[in-house]
Amino acid sequence: MPLVTSVLADGFVFLEGPRWHDGRLFVSDMHDDRVLAVGLDGSVERILDVPTQPSGLGWLPDGRMLVVSMTDRKLLRVDRGGVAVHADLSGIATFHANDMVVDGHGRAYVGNFGWDYESGAPVRKTALALVHPDGRVVRAAEDLAFPNGMVLTPDGRTLIVAETFGQCLTAFDVAGDGSLSNRRLWASVDPVFPDVTGA
């Protein structure tokens, strides 16, 4: 049986950080500074405005939403009373923060550009931030070439990171405290750039 595709919703500028949650697809329309939720019926709800460009999305175990704020390198938390800074990523993120994945314990792994790639400067590798549920930020891994696009395996024991300018997917073992070890090549996608060409 052939697959049939159709447009569910349109009118967006540049969508990033898709996450499925509570029966809807949540996305960051980063160049329009807003977080949206798209229903299976095509309805679109504006969840949050983020003038510093939203990117990665996730949820804490209690249901509160986390949103990466790119240009000011902050992790925002959507509380009942409004939006609060959950963590400051500027000590680790050397340029814009980007994608994120949140585990079942509320720990967030957050990537960043590493450098201003639009400036024409050579690739500069960067670190991956681990944000604990209390907002404490530590370095989870080093020397990643534009980590942007991450997943945790269903058992939560392996983190896979797309290194856009490394042209590879890198895997790590996840310990009980969220720390990463046993870095290894999970897949090489040379000459394709993951997350740029749709890989």
Each model region followed by its residue ranges:
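A short helix->beta-strand "capping" segment at the edge of beta-propeller domains
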Residues: M1-G11, L40-G42, R183-R184
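Beta-rich, blade/repeat-based domains predominating
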Residues: L8-D22, V50-S69, K74, G91-A108, ...
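Beta-propeller domains
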Residues: F26-L48
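Short, solvent-exposed loop/turn segments at conserved positions within beta-propeller repeat blades
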Residues: M30-H31, M70-T71, W115-T126, T164-Q167
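A short loop-to-beta-strand structural motif that recurs across blades of beta-propeller domains
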Residues: R34-L36, K74-L76, T126-A129, C168-T170
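Flexible "stalk/tail and boundary" regions
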Residues: V38-D41, P61, V78-G82, A87, ...
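Beta-propeller fold detector
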Residues: E45-D49, A84-D88, V138-E142, L180-S188
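Short loop/turn segments immediately following beta-strands, especially the blade-tip
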Residues: F172-S179
